[in-house]
Regions:
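Structural preference for beta-strand elements that scaffold enzyme active sites
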Residues: 2-6, 46, 74-78, 98-101, ...
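Active-site-adjacent beta->alpha loops and helix N-cap segments on the catalytic face
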Residues: 3, 54-70, 84-90, 104-125, ...
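Short secondary-structure boundary segments
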Residues: 7, 51, 104-105, 128-130, ...
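Conserved, mostly hydrophobic/aromatic
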Residues: 8, 39, 47, 92, ...
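Conserved anion-binding
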Residues: 11-23, 90, 97-171
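N-terminal beta-alpha supersecondary unit
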Residues: 13-60
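Short, acidic/polar
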Residues: 28-40, 85-90, 144-154
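Catalytic cores of alpha/beta
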Residues: 73, 77-98, 180-215
Length: 237
């Protein structure tokens, strides 16, 4: 299992939200490039990046920052937020990003996901963000009404091999992941599952590993010092 540190970008800065609420955004680091470098120095093999501005309104103001992070640190990175078309996928890959995360568009336009997977294979990841077991869209502001497991099974059936599952109620709360939902998801699909939301202790990492989860995204816990990234990476191996 691997631990993947997160950089959430808003107005070019590293921020964190609580439960996906943009009103709670607060800066957690001054410099995204230096932040990514610290993550790499701690042993991270992949950096998870989210463009919060793009997720909310489709603007791409943070793309220059993403490109700079990859160019200056050599980081292997995945990026999500506001990716709604094949043109968006190609634009993001041109930044040097290794994997593209499709979120809301996967709910509305599964044919787009199928096309992206057919062309780019393992470079396509679907982000499933759930609240009370239903999939949310548009920066978590919209409710699709679809059960997260049914949606994951549908994505796997069209060729998706990587899923990031976020329990919105756990996000940014430092209260541990939703092990029950993750166990149910693990029992339902065979593709790679990366857990996001609430990962904050070495015990959380061990618990996810025991469930057979393939990766864990750590955000707020790393910034607050609650979770030592190097130790978490070691625990996951």
């Amino acid at each position: 299992m691997r631990v993947i540190p997160a950089i959430d970008l808003k107005d070019g800065q590293c921020v964190r939200l609580q439960k996906g609420d943009y009103g709670t955004a607060h800066k957690v680091a001054e410099n995204p490039v230096e932040t990514a470098q610290r993550f790499l120095d701690a042993g991270a093999e992949l950096v998870h990046m989210v463009d919060l501005d793009a997720a909310k309104d489709g603007s791409h103001a943070n793309y220059g920052v993403v490109e700079q992070v990859i160019r200056e640190t050599g980081a292997t990175a995945e990026l999500g937020g506001g990716i709604r078309s094949m043109q968006d996928v190609e634009t993001v890959l041109a930044l040097g990003v290794s994997r593209v995360i499709i979120g809301s568009a996967a709910v509305r336009d599964p044919e787009f996901v199928a096309e992206a997977v057919k062309k780019y294979g393992d470079r396509i990841v679907v982000g499933i963000d759930a609240k009370s077991e239903t999939v949310r869209t548009d920066g978590w502001l919209g409710d699709s009404g679809e059960n997260y497991i049914a949606f994951a099974e549908r994505m796997e059936s069209i060729g998706v091999r990587h899923i990031i599952f976020t329990d919105i109620d756990k996000d940014g709360m430092l209260a541990g992941p939703n092990f029950d939902q993750l166990a149910a998801l693990r029992a339902s699909v065979s593709c790679e599952i990366i857990a996001s939301g609430g990962v904050s202790t070495l015990a959380d990492i061990a618990g996810l590993k025991k469930l057979g989860i393939d990766g864990a995204i750590a955000g707020k816990a790393v910034y607050t010092g609650t979770l030592d990234l190097a130790k978490a990476i070691s625990e996951a191996k």
